[in-house]
Amino acid sequence: MDALVEARGLKKKFGKVTALSDLSVELPPGQPVAILGPNGAGKTTFIRMVATLIRPDEGTLRVGGRDVMREPMAVRRTIGLAGQAAAVEEMMTGRENLVMVARLYGQGRKEAVASAKRILSQMGLEDAADRRVKTYSGGMRRRLDLGASLVGAPRLLLLDEPTTGLDPGSRNEVWDAIREMGAGGTDIVLTTQYLDEADHLAAHIVIIDGGRVIAEGSPDELKSRVGADMVELHTADVETMRRAAEVLGALGVAEPSTDVATRRCSIAAPSGSKLLPLVVRALDDAGVAVEDIALRRPTLDEVFLALTGSTGSASSTSTDHIPTNPKEGAAA
């Protein structure tokens, strides 16, 4: 099966800043893809190239088999883009927003009204369809914005930080909408600053650092690269956590890690479940009581840290040094 997006040797500089440095990747069709990376890694630059908004200095980029440099208009007809901020008109109703977008796509009045009705249903916004958008919650606005990106029935939907700034409840609403869009046959590529979001939504994850791809695969494949499972324990207080870390360190298996905020301590378990009873025995001998203890897989956050040296929180809404000059954003 041909790649949905195929990049070869992409390079891009903004002044003295290198945004992309020999980036090569093939994004598979038929499964949602998440682009992860530290602040300034090149995520947004890459997404905007795929959207034909930025031209590469070097390299080739094909979307759906079409070269973005030679056939930008043909590429644009196959994609939808939802940026970091919801691009909706607050003084109009949700229905009016979608009808307006549909008319801009060239649909007649009757067809535009039908498109708006269909998308409002798909996004779960029927009850709020005739309310002004200024009365919507953040999650509702974001779902409306996602719906607007579907008006042209794109084969590929590009989502740049789709849940940034939303509360947990609104994030879950948007996650449900994204899952439904994917289930409906739309290919989705998203950038995100939330590792749990990538873990929940993506079947394929691409990690970018320093303007190039450093790892990719399914969440399980990436987690397996960290290596061993982890023995993790939770204590009642920080002092007990520190004592537990000393006990784990004395086992000589690996260096334990601690999280003061959650009072958790973990250690790599190369031997898997065989280490668990040894840890329990050592803690008991030292008189260290724990709230709970378990064997678990590495988290995506640990994968991210191992590969980039940054925690997930370092991946933010950076525009990757992209200038606002409209001439720089021209695709053709």
Task: State the predicted function of each range.
Residues 175-270:
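ABC transporter nucleotide-binding domain
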